[in-house]
């Protein structure tokens, strides 16, 4: 069970920030006491920015949040081992499924069994890490099959920790069964963690006979900070509005009482009316789903998650956000959590 002290980190997306910006904020976050830095797979791949971050920071743990399983297992395992070597084993491979429409329309990948595919994906990658020229790897899973895979360079660190992004109960149970940690997605509530996340993670652990003592609970968390609390809360509405359009967040939104606004947001999204989407997001949604307000307020809001998670990964809103706003908020969230 997580303790009462929260580690914090920052996740960088490919939106509204140049690579130079990301490196500047990475150094700023390290100086401020951040424990980890993470990269998404939006606009850029998830690994290259992390390699750059590792080269300009001194001791930061870095991780993908997340790389999707649309990439062939071989490409992911080699990238992960290279990152582990570069960081002296201070890298986390965060994996996720991505929305079904993205897999089908962007990757040409039809995934009708995401949990089975993720199980195969993790097991296959771990087995590939044990391979060599003289010890070829075979993997015969339900979805993924590999035959005679030769690892031309022995893995410098063949036990890279794998964390899974999970929202639904089946994926949460798989995470507890086979992963080293959880990367909860960025719309969540304390109720969701206590009533959905922990029971299902523990069910997966029981299935595998694990005690879970080394398991890390992480969550991406939307964070908007401004001396003007209304401006911060309005900025956070951008991400709430966008992610409320994705059906797999129903498990978070509906029990929290947000089924009605969610449906209206989706109708506005279908009509291409972004201003209407933002207006539909209620004050209660902002209170429950994100960290938003002044620096003092967001630090107090973060304390609600003590005992529920180990690591808070701060995510600056990006959807329909101007570049200047995005840059200012990255600096503000880092300064708000500075030691």
Listing of model-derived features with the role each one plays in the protein:
Residues 1-339:
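Active-site-adjacent structural elements that line small-molecule/cofactor binding pockets in enzymes
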């Amino acid at each position: 069970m997580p303790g009462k002290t929260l580690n914090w980190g920052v996740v960088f997306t490919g939106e509204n920030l140049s690579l130079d910006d990301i490196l500047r904020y990475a150094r700023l976050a390290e100086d401020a006491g951040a424990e980890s830095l993470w990269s998404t797979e939006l606009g850029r791949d998830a690994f290259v920015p992390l390699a750059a971050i590792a080269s300009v920071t001194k001791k930061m743990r870095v991780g993908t949040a997340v790389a999707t399983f649309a990439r062939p297992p071989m490409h992911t395992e080699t990238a992960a081992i290279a990152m582990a070597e570069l960081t002296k084993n201070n890298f986390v491979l965060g994996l996720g499924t991505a929305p079904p429409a993205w897999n089908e329309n962007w990757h040409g990948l039809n995934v009708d069994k995401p949990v089975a595919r993720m199980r195969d994906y993790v097991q296959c990658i771990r087995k590939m890490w044990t391979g060599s020229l003289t010890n070829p790897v075979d993997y015969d899973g339900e979805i993924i099959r590999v035959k005679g895979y030769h690892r031309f360079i022995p893995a410098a660190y063949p036990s890279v920790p794998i964390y899974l992004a999970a929202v639904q109960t089946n994926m949460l149970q798989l995470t507890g069964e086979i992963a080293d940690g959880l990367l909860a997605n960025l719309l969540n509530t304390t109720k969701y963690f206590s009533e959905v996340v922990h029971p299902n993670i523990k069910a997966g652990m029981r299935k595998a006979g694990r005690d879970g003592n080394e398991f890390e609970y992480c969550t991406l968390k939307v964070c908007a900070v401004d001396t003007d609390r209304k401006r911060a809360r309005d900025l956070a509405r951008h991400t709430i509005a966008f992610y409320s359009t994705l059906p797999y967040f129903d498990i978070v939104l509906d029990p929290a009482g947000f089924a009605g606004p969610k449906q209206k947001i989706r109708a506005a999204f279908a009509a291409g009316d972004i201003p209407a989407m933002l207006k539909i997001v209620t004050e209660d949604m902002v209170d429950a789903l994100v960290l938003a307000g002044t620096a003092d307020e967001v630090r107090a809001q973060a304390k609600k998650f003590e005992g529920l998670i180990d690591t808070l990964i701060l995510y600056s809103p990006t959807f329909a956000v101007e570049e200047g706003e995005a840059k200012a908020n990255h600096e503000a969230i880092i300064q708000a959590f500075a030691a």
